[in-house]
Amino acid sequence: FVSYIIMLILPGAFIWKLYDKAYNLTMENYINDSINFLSQAAAGFDKYIESLDERSVRLACDTNLKAMMKIRKPQPAESTVYNIVRFSNELYEKLSYIDKNMGYFVILGDNEFIFTENTVVYGLKYYFDNLRTYQSITYDEWYEQVFYTNNRILFPMRTIQINGKSVDAITYNYPIKGGNNWSTKGVVQFLIRREYLED
């Protein structure tokens, strides 16, 4: 009877050992594949951020942008209106090749102009309250995060209301320096939407 039980246990133990080894190999392969996938995704994201950095640096050094930062809010029919529209069109030509799901924004702090791919808006608070509202932060918090930075920063994924539509996005924020104290006078922003990250 004992030899019969041993005859049953030995093949069972052998099969269990094979199963355990196969399971461990499968898990190891799965973990390695996952690490490789995540490494490739991270490298791709880093490369994308580097391309945004390159575009932002070029734009921050643009002489037309520097001139635009000095313009005050124009009255209707002033010649300055033409300059603003022309600059908006130049921006569109420079940045229109960026994925349409991303969206670009050039936000000037002193004169409160906001250039987007669709329009030019005047008034930072108006823009925040009516056209691009971050649900989890106030206008003052947004202003501080946007303009009190010296380096490029990525704001965490947040729900943003853009023209009445909800979007989950990371905000890329690159400071435009100027003035005597070389402080942040404006920013270049891109919205990196959740859908882009999930693709």
Question: Could you describe each region identified by the protein language model?
Answer:
Residues 46, 60, 92-99, 147:
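Short regulatory alpha-helical segment in sensory/regulatory domains of signaling proteins that mediates
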Residues 98, 104-105:
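Amphipathic heptad-repeat coiled-coil/leucine-zipper-like oligomerization helices
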Residues 1-73:
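Juxtamembrane extracytoplasmic/periplasmic/luminal helical "stalk" adjacent to the first N-terminal
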Residues 35, 39, 84-92, 198:
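Short amphipathic alpha-helical segments
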Residues 96-97, 110-193, 197:
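Extracytoplasmic/periplasmic ligand-binding sensor regions of membrane-associated signaling proteins
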Residues 35, 50-86, 107-112, 119-128:
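Extracellular/periplasmic ligand-binding regions of membrane signal-transduction receptors
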Residues 37, 79-87, 134, 138, ...:
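Soluble or luminal CAZymes and related metallo-dependent hydrolases
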